[in-house]
Amino acid sequence: LGTPISSLNAWQQILAEKYPKDEYVPQMKRDIDRLQMIADRFQKIGSEPTLQAENLIPVLQNAVTYMRARISNRITIDDSCLNEVNRTVMLNAPLLQWVVENLLKNAVDAISGEGAITIQLHENEHDVMIDVSDTGKGIDNKTQRRIFEPGFTSKERGWGLGLPLAKRIIEQYHGGKLLLKSSQVGIGTTFRIILKKPENS
């Protein structure tokens, strides 16, 4: 990814010089910087995980904010549960944010026209659960068995890498779980992320 990102940076600088007052050019720079940060984190997957005990709420809020700016106003995201003060888990913030954004993006893609996405939090003694639900088209039983297979996709334009990579980040890197909690065709889908609380929390 290094060379394409460098090329994007160069083009962004050219645009910034040519259109210094354009409101979208700074946003482009922020997105490129963010892409570089995520790429750097991905390169470290497979090495020793560097997880920290952090509040989950700001990570989820950042993911929602990022997606809201990029979706139709016909789709709502209910994140009222994120008004809670603190939910501390072991995490790597940039990677976890990418996973949540990927789930939100999939939810948006599943909705035709108007619809709703809901984030809910649950917890037990050892774990915090994040549920991302949508009112989209749902996933049939045959597809459900394959959604985490690398290269499998039900989209016309897609590589089939998002969910497998998200699962790897959560399960191998965070020591948690990413699963399809439920899905019904014509009703919607819920994915669940399970993350560990710090020991002695």
Set out the residue ranges of the language-model regions:
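Short beta-strand/loop element within the Bergerat-fold HATPase_c
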Residues: 114-126
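Conserved catalytic submotifs in the C-terminal HATPase_c
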Residues: 76-87, 125
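Short alpha-helical Gxxx[C/S/T] motif in the catalytic ATP-binding
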Residues: 162, 166
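Conserved DHp (HisKA) dimerization/phosphotransfer helix of two-component histidine kinases, i.e.
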Residues: 7, 22-73
